[in-house]
């Protein structure tokens, strides 16, 4: 049985893609063993992300660490996948000729054939094309071990924000046909999955073709998934404010399985910065969406992404972001210091903000967000929350870990048969990033 080591960087789309890489290899070889140490593997894969600073150099650093394994065992297969693979392509082979296969997010289904071609020809294989929906046509049925699962409904992005590489590494937006998505979810439900997380770079741009040739939009998809037997909770990530329509907002009124948590990236509270980012909305328009959502779902918890130190961002503009965070009461959000991505328009903008100032802004924003997170957690003490038990607690092996509808981790004392089940927990203690609870006896 082939032993596979895979290291995944970046977003949930990459996590999903890594699972699919393992699935296609398992189908090809009649099963595989996933190992946690690279030196135990027959196949080593790095599924890369190009969002963070110096992503390319980190990949080559990782490759350098496994080079001695290749020298010791020439039959070892080393592969680079993901967005850095899409950006760098043949350059990876030039810099690291011991790499065997390089493939992008849209060609991971071709991985087994690429390995065979490498072993047959002796030549490294590179495939970073964008064959669109073909990828999903060639993936094996989903197999899961858990109560929650991701389902990719679309890929790519056509927004071309000035700082972002996604359109260049994952291609333009394309949606899976409606029936393909529903079949995968129904299959997961039959395997005991209770929570579905619909996945895409911009899920609310979903436009899936139906059998009759008509187009299903994202709000309609949510309503259909809501009725699939066995599915008890629905999430989605990530969405874009530009296409967060009233029909999607109304789903929060009508669909009780849709959780009271939304991740809706805004990036900045300054209209000038938003314009320079080419985000396509103003801070006021974003606030209008949130106002409508909270009018029909008052308990909605909102998380977001923020970039500080974008080229030209002034202290006043940063203060506008700080005020927006306080006004909307964001929690559980992600704050990043801007770093230029090669090939993006923003990379050409003059950046005169000292790094020390960017760090100060990062810390100031995180302080406000963490305070709000702690406040919300404290309000949950004494309440009973319906939770999905995910497994053994990461903090204490004698405890279990569950997740609330509003995306809080709850550690509690329970029994193994509770794993992957929905249970009621009374929240007894609150911390900044987690909760403690106890089982509510029936």
Curated annotation (Swiss-Prot):
Cofactor or coenzyme needed: [4Fe-4S] cluster
Record-listed E.C. numbers: 2.8.4.3
Residue span(s) of domain TRAM: 378-441
Catalysed reactions, as listed in the record: N(6)-dimethylallyladenosine(37) in tRNA + (sulfur carrier)-SH + AH2 + 2 S-adenosyl-L-methionine = 2-methylsulfanyl-N(6)-dimethylallyladenosine(37) in tRNA + (sulfur carrier)-H + 5'-deoxyadenosine + L-methionine + A + S-adenosyl-L-homocysteine + 2 H(+)
SMART domains recorded: Elp3
Keyword terms, alphabetized: 4Fe-4S, Cytoplasm, Iron, Iron-sulfur, Metal-binding, S-adenosyl-L-methionine, Transferase, tRNA processing
SUPFAM superfamilies tied to this protein: Radical SAM enzymes (SSF102114)
Residues that bind [4Fe-4S] cluster 1: 11, 49, 83
GO molecular function, one term: 4 iron, 4 sulfur cluster binding
Entries under Pfam families matching the protein: Radical_SAM, TRAM, UPF0004
Binding residues for [4Fe-4S] cluster 2: 157, 161, 164
GO cellular component terms attached to this protein's record: cytosol
Swiss-Prot/TrEMBL GO biological process terms: tRNA methylthiolation
Cofactor note: Binds 2 [4Fe-4S] clusters. One cluster is coordinated with 3 cysteines and an exchangeable S-adenosyl-L-methionine.
Cellular localisation: Cytoplasm
Domain MTTase N-terminal residues, every copy: 2-120
Domain Radical SAM core, residue spans: 143-375
Chief localisation class: cytoplasm
UniProt record similarity statement: Belongs to the methylthiotransferase family. MiaB subfamily.
Chain's role: Catalyzes the methylthiolation of N6-(dimethylallyl)adenosine (i(6)A), leading to the formation of 2-methylthio-N6-(dimethylallyl)adenosine (ms(2)i(6)A) at position 37 in tRNAs that read codons beginning with uridine.
Quaternary structure note: Monomer.
Protein name: tRNA-2-methylthio-N(6)-dimethylallyladenosine synthase
Originating organism: Neisseria meningitidis serogroup B (strain ATCC BAA-335 / MC58)
Recorded name of the encoding gene: miaB
């Amino acid at each position: 049985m082939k032993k596979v080591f895979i290291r995944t960087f970046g977003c949930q789309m990459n996590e999903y893609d890594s699972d699919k890489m393992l699935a296609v290899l398992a189908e090809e070889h009649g099963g595989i063993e996933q190992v946690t140490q690279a030196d135990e593997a027959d196949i080593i894969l790095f599924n890369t992300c190009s969002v963070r600073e110096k992503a390319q150099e980190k990949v080559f650093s990782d490759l350098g660490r496994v080079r001695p394994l290749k020298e010791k065992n020439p039959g070892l297969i080393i592969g680079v996948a993901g967005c850095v693979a899409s950006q760098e392509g043949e350059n990876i082979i030039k810099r690291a000729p011991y790499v065997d296969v390089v493939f992008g997010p849209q060609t991971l289904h071709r991985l087994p054939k690429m390995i065979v071609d490498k072993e047959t020809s002796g030549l490294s294989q590179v495939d970073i094309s964008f064959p669109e929906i073909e990828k999903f046509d060639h993936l094996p049925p989903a197999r899961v071990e858990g109560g929650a699962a991701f389902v990719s409904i679309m890929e790519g992005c056509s927004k071309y924000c000035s700082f972002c590489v996604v359109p260049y590494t994952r291609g333009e937006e394309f949606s899976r046909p409606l029936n393909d998505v529903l079949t995968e979810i129904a299959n997961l439900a039959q395997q005991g999955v209770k929570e579905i997380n619909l996945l895409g770079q911009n899920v609310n741009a979903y436009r899936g073709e139906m059998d009759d040739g008509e187009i299903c939009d994202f709000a309609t998809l949510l309503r259909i998934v809501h009725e699939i037997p066995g599915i008890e909770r629905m999430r989605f990530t990530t969405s874009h404010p530009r296409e967060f329509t009233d029909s999607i907002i109304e789903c929060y009124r009508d669909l009780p399985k849709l959780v009271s948590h939304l991740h809706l990236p805004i990036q900045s509270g300054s209209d000038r910065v938003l314009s320079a980012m080419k985000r396509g909305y103003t801070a006021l328009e974003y606030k209008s969406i949130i106002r409508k959502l909270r009018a029909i779902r008052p308990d909605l918890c909102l998380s977001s992404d923020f970039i500080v130190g974008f080229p030209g961002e002034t202290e006043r503009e940063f203060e506008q972001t700080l005020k927006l965070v306080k006004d909307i009461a964001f929690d559980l959000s992600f704050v990043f210091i801007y770093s230029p991505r090669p090939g993006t328009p923003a990379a050409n903008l003059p950046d005169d903000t000292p790094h020390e100032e960017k760090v100060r802004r990062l810390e100031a924003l995180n302080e406000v967000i963490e305070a709000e997170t702690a406040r919300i957690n404290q309000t949950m003490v004494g309440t009973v929350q319906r939770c999905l038990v995910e497994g053994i607690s990461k903090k204490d092996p004698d405890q279990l870990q569950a997740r609330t509808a509003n995306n809080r981790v709850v550690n509690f004392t329970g029994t193994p048969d509770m794993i992957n089940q929905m249970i009621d927990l009374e929240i007894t203690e609150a911390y900044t990033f987690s909760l403690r609870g106890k089982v509510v006896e029936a």
